[in-house]
Curated annotation (Swiss-Prot):
Its EC number is 2.7.1.148. The gene is ispE. The active site is at K20, D145. It comes from Cupriavidus metallidurans (strain ATCC 43123 / DSM 2839 / NBRC 102507 / CH34). GO terms for biological process: isopentenyl diphosphate biosynthetic process, methylerythritol 4-phosphate pathway; terpenoid biosynthetic process. Keywords: ATP-binding, Isoprene biosynthesis, Kinase, Nucleotide-binding, Transferase. Belongs to the GHMP kinase family. IspE subfamily. NCBIfam families: ispE, PRK14608.1. It is an enzyme of class 2 (transferase). One of its GO terms (molecular function) is 4-(cytidine 5'-diphospho)-2-C-methyl-D-erythritol kinase activity. Pfam families: GHMP_kinases_C (PF08544), GHMP_kinases_N (PF00288). Catalyzes the phosphorylation of the position 2 hydroxy group of 4-diphosphocytidyl-2C-methyl-D-erythritol. ATP binds at P103, M104, G105, G106, G107, I108, G109, G110, G111, S112, S113. This is 4-diphosphocytidyl-2-C-methyl-D-erythritol kinase. Pathway: Isoprenoid biosynthesis; isopentenyl diphosphate biosynthesis via DXP pathway; isopentenyl diphosphate from 1-deoxy-D-xylulose 5-phosphate: step 3/6.
Amino acid sequence: MTVGTALPPPELRNCPAPAKLNLFLHVTGRRPDGYHTLQTVFQLIDWSDTLHFHRRDDGVITRVTDIPGVPADTDLVVRAARAMQAASGTRFGVDIAIDKILPMGGGIGGGSSDAATTLLALNRLWGVNLPREELMRIGLSLGADVPVFVFGQNAFAEGVGEELTPVALPDSWFVVIHPRQHVPTAAIFSDERLTRNSPISIVADFAACTNKFAFGRNDLETIATAKFGEVARALEWLKNYSPHARMTGSGACVFARFEDEQTAQRVMERLPSEWDGRCVKSLSHHPLATFA
């Protein structure tokens, strides 16, 4: 915190942590450390967890919400707060509450987005005012998908996902289906059938594509649909309404883009009852983008 500046109020409530879609995802190689190199475009969408923060003066960091299957000490939001505390040298702590809406293991970045919202919110709540690049560096130490949410806009990503270039995307509506099946990321990336040699694209290739939602493919899709039957069935069903429907991330969510809300809602009305679905609008920027 800059000397002489007043602290903001002690609470930040209703902080969104929006989901993302991977419009395509190409696996281009594997590094000696085991991480895969990727190319993808991240599309932010208006479907969010909501986080609430209360500043503490004793330096203690707690998650006050119970999340089944996610111990507080290993939760990315707690790890993000601790990393932010260490990087900034602040004396403050925080109580964090989470309204968890986004499905875990869905490929839409829920945990990573929660971590990024924590970094952005604490940057404001603690008055530390770290630059965005520093928050992105902290985010990368937590997970490869965290930096794009801190980056704050739709982006063409390379490396392990941390080399980001902003891209302009048209306003869109999406149907996102979660087939109520958890897909562990490690189970997909460790599969021996995964191809890891997709040709390198450049951002100009994507920018020049007239239908950006038909560009490329998701290299993880064939593995996920072979291993997880509900993912395959949901994708096959959605392709009846959009030939360019595809999986996001390593699954389990699948999505399709539509020109308008009415068309997307008509598809949603036909959704089989055994799956969960959502009609969502695209975002051009993260709701907390100005916090860094």
